[in-house]
């Protein structure tokens, strides 16, 4: 988290407006999925989304706190707060619209907006998740909605593989 915060701070120090989309920490989503399956192998998809989206919520709060500790104005945002509007397909939702009104105000005011990736809000106001890789999808969609000059995606994996390295 502190490494990410330092990278974000360098962008801010260079005069850039920065929106950061985060994923859950490595292994956390799998842990949360395991908890859901342990409680109920036939779980409700809506409750599944509430559980697995919590990994991003922790990460985004920690990043905002790390930035604030470096004197970088920052605030965390969850998908429903923005809102990132999706269809109602829980665990595999698709982004329909992102209202950037409040984020634009914050960015123009010099604040770093830290967004929890992988999640949005369904038409019935329930949390949705976008499926695996959803944080990258969130980052690209948010960059497009904000008309960003660029979208940089960083990851904590060792490299790019053409096959599953665990085989």
Predicted regions, residues:
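Nucleotide/pyrophosphate-binding catalytic subdomain
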Residues: 1-167
């Amino acid at each position: 988290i502190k490494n990410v915060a330092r990278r974000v701070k360098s962008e801010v120090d260079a005069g850039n407006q920065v929106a950061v989309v985060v994923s859950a920490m490595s292994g956390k989503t799998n842990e949360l999925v395991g908890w859901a399956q342990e409680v109920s192998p036939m779980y409700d998809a809506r409750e599944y989304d509430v559980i697995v989206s919590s990994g991003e919520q922790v990460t985004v709060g920690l990043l905002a706190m790390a930035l604030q500790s470096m004197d970088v104005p920052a605030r965390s945002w969850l998908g429903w707060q923005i809102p990132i509007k999706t269809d109602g397909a829980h665990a595999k939702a698709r982004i329909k619209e992102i209202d950037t009104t409040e984020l634009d105000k914050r960015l123009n005011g010099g604040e770093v907006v830290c967004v929890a990736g992988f999640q949005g809000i369904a038409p019935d106001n329930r949390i949705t998740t976008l499926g695996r890789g959803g944080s990258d999808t969130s980052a690209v969609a948010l960059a497009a909605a904000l008309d960003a000059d660029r979208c940089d995606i960083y990851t904590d994996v060792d490299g790019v593989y053409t096959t599953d390295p665990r085989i």
